């Protein structure tokens, strides 16, 4: 009987201890990835990109924007969900610097930044700037996405504050892989429209790449050989540009998490420092 009496106090004791005023606050929910649909200005087709707002987002405060371009065969979700080092690094950098994070389809799984993809990305940037207080726009990507980042930055340097390209090509006239996909994207073969291939080759336009720029390469990369990107970096160094090259002679077609973070950190820190300098 005495034993039962003592047990009867347990619910009351628990109720007193777990008073509503002392209850733990529920964990803060991370912002959900938004799958955004829009109508492309260039051809009125429906296109998509993924948007992630930072946890500390405020519509009244300026935020910088990081756009991540997927590789050949992937789509807008690669840099949002993929656990590989390049993608995790981009997501972690966006969190660290409180960046708005966007990953577009830019037309196709095999886009290579042709005219339609270029138009879509320009439209996305303009629409995001009209909706949010965008301070600076950073561009990154791996493989096809890295190549496309260099292409877009050379075509629209006024829109981009920094570029981090992982395992890219900088010369489409020289590059020979994935030609069927590139021809579909660019609108013909390099023999038919050499000017279009040159236009989309960053190596030919170093004077336009005035923003901080970083590249990671693998010396044993046969998918996207590193030679043109090395040449581009050397030219930019001659022009006294702010550049970083991480060249791993024994690596293939990949960039580690640490190297991916390093090239992203470089462009953000250099661009931020450049932005804070008083006008001369």
Regions found by a protein language model. Name each.
Residues 58-63, 68-112:
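Short substrate-entry loop that stabilizes the transition state in hydrolases
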Residues 113, 223-280:
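C-terminal catalytic histidine-bearing segment of alpha/beta-hydrolase fold enzymes
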Residues 130, 135-181:
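Primarily recognizes the serine-hydrolase "nucleophile elbow" in alpha/beta-hydrolase
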Residues 21-63, 182, 192-195, 243, ...:
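A domain-start/cap signature at the N-terminus of enzymes
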Residues 209, 215-217, 221:
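Short beta-strand/loop motif that positions the catalytic acidic residue
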Residues 112-131:
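Alpha/beta-hydrolase active-site loop
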Residues 78-85, 168-205, 211:
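Mobile cap/lid helix-loop segments that gate and shape the active-site cleft of serine hydrolases
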């Amino acid at each position: 009987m005495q034993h039962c009496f003592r047990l009867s106090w347990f619910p009351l004791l628990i109720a007193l201890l777990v008073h509503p005023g002392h209850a733990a606050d529920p964990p803060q929910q991370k912002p959900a990835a938004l799958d955004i649909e829009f109508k492309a200005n260039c051809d009125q087709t429906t296109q998509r990109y993924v948007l992630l707002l930072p946890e500390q987002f405020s519509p009244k405060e300026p935020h910088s924007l990081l756009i991540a371009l997927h590789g050949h065969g992937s789509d807008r979700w690669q840099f949002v969900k993929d656990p590989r080092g390049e993608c995790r690094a981009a997501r972690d950098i966006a969190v660290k610097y409180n960046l708005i994070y966007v990953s577009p389809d830019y037309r196709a799984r095999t886009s290579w930044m042709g005219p339609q993809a270029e138009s879509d990305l320009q439209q996305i940037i303009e629409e995001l700037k009209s909706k949010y207080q965008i301070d600076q726009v950073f561009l990154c990507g791996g493989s096809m996405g890295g190549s496309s980042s260099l292409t877009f930055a050379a075509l629209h340097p006024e829109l981009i504050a920094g570029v981090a390209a992982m395992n890219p090509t900088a010369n489409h006239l020289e590059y020979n892989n994935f030609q069927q996909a590139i021809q579909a994207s660019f609108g013909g073969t390099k023999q038919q429209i050499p000017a279009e291939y040159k236009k989309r080759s960053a190596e030919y336009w170093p004077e336009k790449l005035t923003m901080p720029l970083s590249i990671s390469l693998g010396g044993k990369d046969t998918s996207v050989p590193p030679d043109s990107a090395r040449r581009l970096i050397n030219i930019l160094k001659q022009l006294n540009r702010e550049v970083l090259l991480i060249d791993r002679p024994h690596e293939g077609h990949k960039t580690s998490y640490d190297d991916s973070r390093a090239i992203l950190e470089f462009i953000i820190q250099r661009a931020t420092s450049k932005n804070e300098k008083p006008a001369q």
